[in-house]
Swiss-Prot record:
One GO CC term, this protein: t-UTP complex
HEAT repeats: 426-467, 581-619, 1043-1081, 1250-1288, 1294-1333, 1755-1793
GO biological process: maturation of SSU-rRNA from tricistronic rRNA transcript (SSU-rRNA, 5.8S rRNA, LSU-rRNA); positive regulation of transcription by RNA polymerase I
Assembly and oligomerization: Component of the ribosomal small subunit (SSU) processome.
Name the record gives this protein: U3 small nucleolar RNA-associated protein 10
Annotated organism of origin: Aspergillus niger (strain ATCC MYA-4892 / CBS 513.88 / FGSC A1513)
Length: 1800
């Protein structure tokens, strides 16, 4: 019972929102997304609102939809809103607003303002607790971000099962991966439903965003796939049932999602789910249809592609190929659906969708009101979207639909025609014909019925016998059609065909009759009924035009083949029974058209009609029978028809047309060939036709042409024109003349009219345009003019397509027009092209000129216009005087002049573009005109101050093409006298255009090949220009230009100079100067290639030295130049490179001579603006030194020595010797000119660097025998330099080098030249370092000599320093082998060290050298340094430490090595012996000494410390006594107090290091000894000494307790009594005891702080220390002492309270402390201790610190404090009163309640 009640109470407590529980409320509102808990706890709602409102305002700027929330959840009033005080309705209303805001802000959560704004909802409205689901779902798309992790951390612990997936990640504080979320969506229906619900709600609110929708789509798609996969079962029924459950869950979501059309990503996500459903489950067709309708009904322009893909996948899963009507209509409404289907078919299966579209296209054929569906059907087959199998199925669907079309109603004639054409396409297409034939065979379709329904003939398909069912069906169809025909026949019985059916295009009566005729086709009975109609006047067929014209129009129109064949049959039947007294020549044009038809059946029937006409003419006895419909056939236009005499017609038919009847049937093109041959007066082979005479041909041609012109029907007209346009002329007339009226008529026809007449007869406007303009024959001399006259002058009424056709015809006939006519025609076109108004006429003329192949004469005529035009333009300018005085010499122009200038520019541009595009290389005769143009342009650009870059580029390009073609021939193809090289060079120099520059340079290069004598005198400015311009370019074309210029111009230039017997180097100096001057502007990656090409073309042997010298002279030691020079010499062989260097040195020598020669030309030596010869020489020599060092000469020489014969090797040695002599000669001659001398020395060094070490030493030995000491020193320095680098280490080199040592030792012992000795010692140093380890015995003697009087015993400072350093190197190399040389070395080196430290004679270099020597000894042979040596070193080191003339680094390094390497006992002993010397030397020496001790302790093992503890203790006690010693000296003290403090810090650090290496047993006696030393070790009368030792001791204890912490807390028992004593006498206000007091306070704080053993919790310890410690607060007598006491005593007291850790102890402390808070005597009458306000202030600070540190534990004593607080709140001192109020607020914050009631 009790436990149950307790549980209930705990639940109530957990859910309680007790308003009085301030602490709980503060915790509840301290959950934050952006602040940590500790910070959030301290913030009030005003602060939070201010921060969050700023973020909200920024959001409003981003999206105005946030603005309404400023009146609700972000209003000022919201700060006071508390959900716990709201009722259910208010909370529900708040939820609505909060969720609306969260939905809207979801897309901005990665922005800082949004996070701030949401934080307000969390802090004020606690949405993470009240709206948990909505909040989580808002943040869920960002599950990988730190923001989501922040949300997880503040979510309530009891998450609902919906989000149980988040629990483990909330606990472990890591972001959830994707997989668990998807798995939860798959298995947790509540989670998936929540995500779907949230996504749809946000989307309906139009607050959707990419992050949400991509997360939702991916999650839902994978979840559905997972659910379907997990539902798989071995039993199909079970699996189907589970799949249906999944589908039923998802369908409502899809339904809602697809309804939101404008949310594109949501809709596409639904498509993805539909695809998964279709792919992974077996859906019924009905459900798939529903999905397809939904998909098709949802797409927009943005989603249609995805929707189409989804539709194709869904269709693919259907068992029935048909698609729903709504889906079909949606596809049909798409813009270009076939193209879109084609785009997706490459990646997705579309076959079923395509079949569904085919089925939709042929559904309800009789009810289709337009041809849009049938157009789509045709496109599906034309684009080859269907595979072979699908194409067969589609054809079967079409054939079935057509076969049953008549059962549904009457098929319109247009639909019938369209389908007939499609079927014909099936039979004629190479790819579709086999499929169609197989489909016919497999589907058992009645071909005859199909042909009947479509009124067409299906060729090349075997006829199949219809099945019984088909026959029955046919009967049913027949009955339906008969009923239909009867009613239609009755409706047209009253129609009247007024005149010929050919008299007009639009005849309603004819349209009705032809529809009826189409229904009658196939039934003789119906046909009979139809032809008996009164409107046709069959009885008067030979005299009236109605009957025959009706059938003529029908068979020549765009109708089904069956209908046309039947029409021909009716004509044939009539002719077979007709009398021969009628002339039917009017039928001939239409029969010719029918004989050219693509259908063989039509051609066969037409041939029959032609044969019947031939029979009639044979039977005719009258010469001139009546011509049928002569005056009525075309209505009013009949009068213009040219008829043929009866006998002539008979001749024409019998001789020309009848012989080929069989061929017409077999070949549709045969009639065209026959007609062409007939009209040309020839006969086709094997045709049997005979040639007609000219009058007959003329009659026939004019007859046919007049019919073509006059007939109103465009279908036969177009076909007839195609036949006639094969014939240029006949019988003395041309088709241009005869068909001209039609061309005019067609030209004048308005666009909409032309479109209407062509659409009525299903012909293309473009086809008529093409045939109309083809009536103009190219054999007509005025063909171009005639064509042009049809569009010029231009009228806006002209149709653009007709204009285009005209110009296309011009292009087609241009090549056949005579050249002289081309010139005239081109002139006309050119004039029109330059008209101001931009019309299709102008554009067309320009296009013709650009498209046709213009002859040279035309182009030359155009070119000649340019100079003339420029001259004319200049004549319009102002007077010469005004022009000369105008600013910048510009031609002053009026607006009118500017317009003329613009016209001129356009004209010149057009001409030059025409020349450029007309393969100018094929017209070399243009060269003269182009050079004249170039001259005119060059003059003109100077007049108008314009670059004319484009025009110049075109001109130069054309010239370049001509010149390049001429280069390949033996002789120039044009007169070279017209070449103007000066103009080309001026183009290079005066233009800023890179294109012009490049073209001009290439032209110069080309001209230099075909006419060098005309070019070379102008070539130098070219290279000057190249240096300043072209060489700077970095594009590939410019690179090619430069290459060609160098390749072609330079060889010609060199050859020219040689022919003139001039020095080639001097002659090309300007060229070389141009290139070297351009170096810095040439792109870095191209420099080497360019200069290499230049040098190669000039000749490496002759020119390389000059190029190198000029580069070195101009750029000195520029790194890029040196790299280039190295690259240039690297490709040369060793002899060539050495020869180059020899010439280079000759040039240096020449530059230094009094009368410079070639150097004056190449380097400008001696010229007015030339550089100082000596500076030039220095630059050249330094560059040469660089080349010796960095080129591959050494490798090449070694290779040649190894592989080449004696001749090459001898050549190399000779050249090397010559170079050496040249260098030495320059050095000797310029010995007094230091820069040149040094530079020659550098060259010598680098030269020797090319030798192997053995060869080098051989050379040095020879040179050392010379008497020139300067040379000897120089070569030794070279040797040293060589050894400083990485010399050879092979065996031979090592032995040779060690064998060289005696030579050097001999120099040291015998030479009086100190500098030479110095160089020898330096060499010995290097040899010992590099090779000494190989054979130490060879080095020992050298070491003894260096240590002797002959070297470091000399008075010269330099030799001493070098010698000591050499000994250091030897010590390192030889190790113990060095011992024989040590006695002299140690004694002399210590003496030298002492000398280096003499006052006023300090020698830092010698000082450092000696310490380097001792460092080497300490490392390699430390046992050889005795105690006396160590004493000496230490004493001298103390002196060095205080000496200002030397550096500390080397000494410190040596002392550190002593501490590390020398025996530690010897080190400690030496320091102990010399401690007073260190102290006497001062703080720096003392610090260094302690540093040695510290390092020795650190680097040696524990055992060494324990073993030497006595001497170590001795050192430390001496060190600890430093403060007392300095105090005792009083004014004579050598250490400042700060120095003492610093050194004591070091001593404390050293002592701690020592303690770490000792155990307690070893250290405790030392500690007690130290305590005795500090407390009783000084006589009582020496108060100052005692204080000094105590200060030192307590400073140590401060570090001791602070560093070793709880390990040594127990040591406090040793000092507690002394501490109390110290606290009694030390005072922070007394300068003598202040340091002791501070050390004591800090020591106590460290001891209290690290007490883990309850040492200070013990009453015996606490009672002893508490009163003395708290009493220290009484030292706060003024502001300065109060600040010290508060800073030092209060922390110590606080730590003591923490360590005390019990209520009783706290009470005891508080009791003592409270006394200091009372300013007057208590009830007992005794002084309380708080009389001074500073004391009370300090006590208050202590209380504040204790309250902060201990919190509620300390405030358990609040009842005792309250009276004191009440008194203090009325204290006289303002500071005290202010602090007590702070304390009260602090108490209230901790307790969560106010103290007002308690204080009253």
């Amino acid at each position: 019972m009790a436990s149950s009640l307790a549980a209930q109470l705990s639940q109530i407590a957990a859910k309680s929102t007790n308003q009085l529980n301030l602490k709980a409320q503060r915790i509840a509102h301290s959950q934050s997304l952006i602040f940590d808990w500790k910070t959030a706890t301290t913030q009030d709602f005003d602060t939070v609102y201010q921060i969050c409102f700023e973020g909200f305002q920024e959001l409003c700027q981003l999206d105005p939809r946030f603005a309404p929330f400023e009146r609700t959840i972000f209003s000022e009033q919201s700060k006071a809103e508390d959900r716990t005080e709201m009722n259910a309705a208010q909370n529900k209303e708040l939820d609505t607003v909060v969720e609306a805001f969260l939905a809207l802000v979801g897309g901005h959560l990665l922005l800082s303002p949004a996070v701030k704004a949401v934080d307000w909802l969390i802090r004020r409205f606690r949405v993470h607790e009240y709206n948990t689901e909505f909040t989580i779902l808002t943040f869920l798309p960002y599950y990988t971000t730190p923001l989501f992790l922040n949300l997880l951390s503040i979510l309530p612990e009891d998450l609902t099962p919906t989000f149980k997936i988040l629990n483990p990640y909330k606990k472990s504080q890591i972001n959830p991966p994707r997989h668990p979320l998807v798995h939860s969506a798959t298995t947790n229906k509540h989670f998936l439903a929540a995500v779907n619900r949230y996504t749809l709600q946000v989307s309906k609110q139009r607050a959707h965003h990419h992050a949400l929708l991509s997360f939702w789509a991916g999650t839902l798609t994978e979840a559905v796939a997972g659910m379907l996969d997990s539902s798989r079962s071995g039993r199909r029924e079970v699996e189907k049932e589970k799949h249906e459950d999944v589908v039923m869950k998802v369908l409502p979501v899809l339904n809602d999602g697809l309804a939101l059309k404008d949310v594109s990503e949501l809709v596409i996500g639904c498509y993805m789910v539909c695809v998964v459903l279709a792919q992974k489950s077996s859906l019924q067709d009905k459900l798939l249809d529903g999905l397809m309708e939904a998909v098709a009904g949802s797409w927009t322009d943005e989603t249609k592609e995805s929707g189409l893909i989804c539709l194709s996948v869904l269709a693919q899963k259907k068992s029935d190929a048909r698609i729903p009507k709504r889906a079909f209509k949606a596809v049909l409404r798409l813009e270009d659906p076939v193209q879109q289907l084609s785009a997706i078919s490459a990646q997705y299966p579309t076959s079923h969708l395509l079949l569904g579209l085919v089925a939709g296209c042929v559904d309800d054929l009789s009810k289709q009101k337009d041809l849009s569906r049938l157009d789509l059907l045709s496109l599906l087959f034309e684009t080859n979207l269907l595979g072979e199998q699908e194409a067969g199925k589609a054809m079967a669907v079409i054939l079935q639909a057509v076969s049953h079309a008549h059962t549904e109603g009457v098929l319109s004639l247009d639909a019938q025609t369209h389908l007939a054409e499609l079927v014909q396409h099936f039979t004629q297409s190479e790819s579709l014909q086999p499929i169609f034939q197989k489909t016919i065979e497999d589907s058992s379709i009645d071909v005859a019925a199909l042909e009947h329904n479509l009124q067409t003939v299906i060729e090349s398909v075997p006829t199949t016998t219809p099945a019984i069912g088909d026959v029955e069906m046919e009967d049913v169809q027949q009955e339906a059609v008969e009923d239909n025909f009867a009613s239609v026949l009755e409706s047209v019985a009253g129609k009247n065909l007024e005149s010929s059916a050919l008299s007009a295009q639009s005849m309603p009566a004819y349209e009705s009759l032809v529809q009826t005729f189409a229904l009658a086709v196939g039934s003789q009975e119906k046909l009979q009924a139809f032809v008996d109609l009164p409107a046709l006047k069959k009885a008067d067929a030979s005299t009236s035009p109605q009957y025959l014209s009706f059938f003529i129009r029908t068979f020549s129109g765009s109708y089904p083949i069956g209908t046309r064949i039947t029409a021909l049959n009716q004509i044939s039947s009539l002719l077979n029974s007709a009398t021969p007294d009628v002339d039917l020549q009017a039928l001939l044009p239409f029969l010719l058209v029918a004989l050219a038809d693509s259908s063989e059946r039509v051609r066969r029937e037409a041939a029959g009609v032609l044969a019947a006409i031939g029979s009639l003419y044979k039977k005719s006895k009258k010469g001139d029978a009546n011509v049928w419909a002569r005056d009525t056939i075309y209505g009013k236009q009949s009068k213009n028809v040219q008829w043929i005499a009866g006998r002539d017609v008979q001749k024409i038919v019998e001789r020309a047309f009848l012989p080929g009847l069989e061929e017409y049937v077999l070949d549709q093109a045969h009639i065209g060939r026959v007609l062409e041959a007939t009209l040309r007066g020839s006969s086709t082979s094997d045709s049997g036709a005979t040639e007609l005479k000219k009058p007959l041909r003329l009659s026939l041609f004019t007859f046919l042409c007049s019919h073509a012109v006059q007939m109103p029907l465009y279908a036969p007209k177009l076909s007839l024109l195609k036949l006639l346009n094969r014939v240029d002329k006949a019988g003395g007339t041309t088709r241009t003349k005869e068909l001209g009226p039609f061309l005019k008529t067609w030209r004048d026809m308005k666009e909409h009219t032309a479109k209407d007449v062509c659409e009525r007869e299903r012909v293309s406007v473009a086809d008529v345009d093409r045939e109309a303009v083809m009536t103009v024959t190219p054999k007509d001399k005025d063909a171009i003019s005639l064509l042009l006259s049809n569009v010029s002058p231009y009228s806006d009424s002209l149709r653009p397509s007709f204009v285009t056709a005209i110009f296309n015809r011009m292009k087609a006939v241009w090549g056949t027009v005579a050249e002289e006519l081309q010139v005239d025609a081109a002139e006309k076109l050119f004039e029109i092209s330059l008209e101001d108004v931009q019309t299709p006429l102008v554009h067309g003329c320009r296009d013709v000129l650009r498209s046709v192949q213009l002859t040279g004469s035309v182009l030359l005529q155009f070119l000649r216009k340019i100079p003339v035009s420029i001259t004319d333009m200049e004549s319009l300018g102002p007077a010469p005087k005004r022009r000369r005085t105008s600013q910048n010499n510009m031609v002053a122009m009026t607006i009118k002049d500017e317009a003329k200038l613009s016209q001129l520019m356009e004209k010149m541009t057009f001409i030059l573009e025409l020349v450029d595009s007309s393969t100018p290389e094929a017209h070399p005769e243009l060269a003269d005109g182009l050079f004249q143009t170039l001259a005119a342009l060059h003059h003109f650009k100077s007049q108008i101050q314009s670059g004319l870059s484009y025009l110049l580029s075109l001109t130069l390009g054309s010239l370049l093409a001509i010149v390049n073609r001429s280069k390949g021939t033996a002789k120039a193809q044009f007169d070279t006298s017209v070449i103007r090289a000066d103009l080309v060079v001026d183009c290079v120099r005066t233009t800023d255009s890179p294109q012009v520059q490049n073209a001009a340079l290439l032209l110069v290069a080309g001209l230099s090949v075909i006419a060098p004598e005309l070019v070379l005198h102008s070539v130098m400015p070219i290279f000057t220009f190249m240096g300043s311009s072209v060489l700077r370019k970095d594009d590939e074309y410019s690179v090619s230009v430069i290459d060609q210029t160098i390749d072609q111009v330079v060889p010609a230039l060199i050859q020219s100079l040689r022919n003139q017997k001039r020095d080639v180097v001097s002659g090309t100096s300007e060229l070389l100067l141009s290139f070297t001057a351009a170096f810095e502007h040439i792109p870095s990656h191209r420099r080497l290639r360019l200069f290499h090409a230049l040098v190669t073309k000039l000749g490496t042997q002759d020119f390389l030295f000059a190029v190198l010298a000029m580069l070195a002279n101009r750029y000195a030691l520029d790194k890029d130049v040196l790299i280039l020079m190295t690259g240039l010499v690297s490709d040369a062989s060793a002899p060539v490179e050495l020869n180059t260097y020899s010439k280079f040195l000759d040039l240096v020598k020449d530059s230094l001579s009094s009368k410079p020669g070639i150097s004056q030309v190449l380097l400008g030596i001696g010229s007015d603006d030339g550089r100082d010869p000596q500076k030039v020489a220095v630059d050249l020599l330094r560059a040469l030194a660089y080349l010796f060092k960095h080129s591959s000469l050494k490798v090449k020489m070694a290779k040649d020595f190894a592989t080449e014969g004696d001749k090459v090797v001898g050549q190399i040695r000779t050249l090397f010797s010559r170079i050496l002599e040249q260098v030495l000669a320059i050095g000797e001659s310029m010995q007094n000119v230091k820069p040149v001398s040094q530079a020659s020395g550098d060259v010598l060094s680098a030269l020797f660097g090319t030798l192997s070490l053995v060869d080098f030493l051989d050379t040095i030995e020879v040179l050392l025998q010379r008497r020139n000491d300067e040379l000897r020193r120089k070569v030794l320095r070279l040797l040293e330099g060589r050894l400083r680098q990485n010399p050879e280490r092979d065996g031979a080199s090592q032995h040779r080098m060690l064998d060289f040592l005696p030579t050097l030792v001999n120099i040291i012992q015998s030479s009086p030249d100190i500098l030479l000795k110095h160089a020898a010692v330096a060499c010995i140093d290097r040899i010992a370092e590099k090779y000494g380890r190989k054979e130490p015995t060879k080095v020992i003697h050298a070491a003894q000599v260096v240590a002797s009087e002959a070297c470091i015993g000399q008075d010269d400072e330099r030799i001493r320093i070098m010698g000591v350093l050499c000994l250091a190197s030897m010590a390192e190399v030889l190790g113990e082998a060095m011992i024989p040389a040590l006695p002299d070395a140690l004694s002399r080196s210590l003496a030298l060290l002492e000398q280096s430290l003499e006052d006023g004679k300090e020698n830092a270099r010698l000082h450092d050298a000696v310490y380097s020597f001792f460092s080497a000894l300490f490392i390699h042979i430390p046992f050889m340094v005795s105690g006396s040596h160590l004493d000496k070193i230490l004493v001298l080191s103390y002196k060095s430490a205080v000496s200002e003339g030397v550096e500390d680094e080397s000494r410190e390094e040596a002392l550190q090595l002593m501490a590390r390497k020398v025996d530690v006992a010897a080190t400690y002993a030496a320091i102990d012996r010399n401690w007073q010397h260190a102290v006497k030397a001062g703080p720096d020496a003392t610090r260094e000494t302690l540093g040695v001790v510290s390092l020795a302790i650190e680097k040696h093992p524990k055992s060494a410390t324990v073993k030497n503890i006595a001497v170590l203790t001795s050192i430390l006690f001496k060190a600890f006594d430093l403060r007392r010693e300095q105090v005792s000296l009083d004014t004579q003290a050598t250490f400042e107090l700060s120095d003492v403090d610093e050194i004591e810090d070091i001593i404390n650090e050293v002592t701690i290091k020592m303690i770490y290496k000792l155990n307690d047993t070893t250290f405790r006696p030392i500690f007690t000894k130290l305590l005795e030393w500090a407390t009783t070790g000084v006589p009582k009368k020496d108060a100052r000494g005692s204080l000094a030792r105590l200060t030192t001791f307590y400073r140590f204890l401060q570090v001791f307790f602070g560093t070793l912490q709880s390990i040594v807390t127990g040591y406090s028992s040793y000092i507690i009594e002394n501490v109390v004593s110290v606290l009694g006498k030390a005072n922070p206000s007394n300068q003598d005891t202040k340091s002791l007091w501070l050390a004591t306070m800090r020591m106590l704080k460290n001891s209290f702080e690290h007490d883990q053993d309850e040492f200070w919790q013990s009453p015996s310890h606490l009672t002893v220390i508490a009163q003395p410690l708290i009493s220290q607060l009484a030292h706060a007598k003024n502001s300065s002492t109060a600040s010290i006491v508060i800073a030092e005593a209060v922390p110590a007291l606080t730590e003591l309270a923490v360590a005390a850790d019990s209520t009783d102890n706290h009470k005891e402390l508080n009791t003592v402390l409270m006394r200091l808070l009372r300013p007057s005597a208590g009830p007992s009458g005794k002084t309380a201790g708080g009389e001074n306000p500073h004391t009370r202030l300090a006590a208050l600070k202590a209380q504040q610190s204790l309250t902060e540190q201990l919190g509620e534990e300390w405030l358990a004593l609040l009842p005792e404090m309250l009276p004191y607080i009440s008194e203090l709140m009325e204290d006289e001192d303002e500071n005290v009163e202010r602090e007590v109020r702070k304390w009260v607020k602090q108490i209230e914050d901790v307790l969560g309640e106010r103290l007002d009631d308690m204080l009253t």
